[in-house]
């Protein structure tokens, strides 16, 4: 373990890797990251699988074994195999943490982002296909995704809610989670091992808001560059604390073994070279959060990260930052609505590339 990753973990942050591939699984890389960099979970998304499945070689034996199946089936076989194997690698981590950590996420088809029933159906299919208690099914926090989140949790299935950008949507996600856990309880499920994370995207907010601030050009605008994303996320943590402390249903569910849905900081790689490469880790350290990060960010954290608590005591300042943005005419809801739409579109584009690459692989290995 490095001092910085250990300090980050000791401060309450679970470090997850935002990456997965067949070569990473087979090389022993995950075991090394568990042993040496405090990594206790993995997230995937269509863009990650696009990168992984573009590799010629690691997936060929399974493609040959599958034969000339349709491409949708092949993609699901390849991706669920990777996730199943990764969950096995993280099983000991899961058991030692009472299934708080050791989780590996797999996302529903992004083309279903605005289809509630189809999302719910595929979430159940993926859960059964991976067939591991430390898996998590990723469902986007679109308006249509919210009831699917509740319905999936009600079946006792662990859910990672993805593509959350706004406080308004995050509050709806928490409500969907608590309702889902209440239904799971009513359905007789053991609540102890139902896990959930709320993937709140960070750096993309700065990328979008900074462009608006640069266009404004004033000294007041310049002083706010690089501040919107962290302020937004810190206020999400304030919302997390308040909602679970004050929801009248939660105390009874927690007494039955339910665990709070964890804030999960996503999109934490720094996209602006002027900012610290640990910015979206070091500035969002607090108890019971997850930070899922690309390996480049993980290596930066391990090398020179801080890891000290950094959210407590920042709420007043964070509210002030958001108010100043509004005073400059920046409508954060417009920004986050566009980021959600763009996020869904980007994942669909990646998924289309995955399908094309896997079809090419099927054709190549089967002549």
Identify the residue ranges that each predicted region occupies.
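N- or domain-start disorder-to-order transition segments that initiate the globular core
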Residues: 1-30
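Active-site beta-loop-alpha junctions enriched in small/polar residues
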Residues: 18-22, 47, 107-113, 140-144, ...
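Conserved, mostly hydrophobic/aromatic
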Residues: 45, 106, 137, 152, ...
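Active-site beta->alpha loop and helix N-cap motifs at the rims of alpha/beta catalytic domains
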Residues: 48-148
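Catalytic alpha/beta core domains of metabolic enzymes, predominantly
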Residues: 158-296
């Amino acid at each position: 373990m490095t001092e910085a990753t250990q300090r980050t973990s000791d401060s309450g942050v679970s470090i997850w890797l935002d990456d997965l591939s067949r070569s990473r699984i087979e090389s022993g890389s995950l075991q090394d990251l568990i042993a040496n960099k405090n990594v206790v979970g993995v997230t995937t998304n269509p863009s990650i699988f696009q990168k992984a499945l573009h590799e010629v070689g690691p997936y060929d034996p399974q493609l040959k074994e599958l034969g000339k199946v349709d491409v949708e089936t092949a993609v699901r076989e390849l991706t669920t195999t990777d996730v199943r194997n990764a969950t096995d690698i993280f099983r000991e981590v899961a058991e030692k943490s009472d299934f708080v950590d050791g989780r590996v996420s797999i996302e529903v088809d992004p083309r279903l982002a605005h289809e509630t029933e189809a999302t719910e159906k595929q979430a159940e299919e993926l859960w059964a296909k991976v067939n591991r208690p430390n898996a998590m099914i990723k469902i986007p926090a679109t308006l249509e995704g919210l009831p699917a989140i509740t319905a999936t949790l009600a079946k006792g299935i662990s859910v990672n809610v993805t593509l959350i950008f706004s406080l308004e949507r995050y509050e709806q996600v928490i409500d969907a989670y608590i309702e889902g856990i209440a239904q799971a309880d009513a359905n007789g499920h053991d609540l102890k091992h139902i896990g959930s994370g709320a993937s709140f995207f960070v750096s993309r907010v700065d990328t979008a808001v900074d462009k608006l601030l640069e266009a404004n050009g004033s000294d007041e605008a310049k002083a706010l560059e690089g501040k919107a994303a962290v302020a937004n996320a810190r206020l999400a943590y304030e919302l997390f604390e308040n909602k679970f402390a004050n929801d009248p249903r939660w105390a009874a569910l927690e007494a039955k073994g339910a665990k709070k849905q964890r804030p999960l900081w996503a999109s934490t790689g720094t996209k602006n070279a002027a900012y610290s490469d640990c910015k979206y880790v070091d500035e969002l350290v607090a108890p019971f959060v997850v930070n899922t990060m690309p390996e480049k960010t993980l290596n930066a954290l391990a090398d020179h990260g801080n890891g000290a608590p950094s959210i407590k005591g920042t709420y007043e300042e964070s509210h002030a930052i958001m108010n100043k943005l509004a005073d400059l005419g920046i409508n954060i809801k417009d920004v986050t609505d566009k980021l959600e739409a763009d996020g869904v579109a980007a994942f669909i584009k990646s998924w289309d590339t995955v399908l094309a690459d896997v079809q090419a692989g099927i054709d190549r290995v089967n002549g």
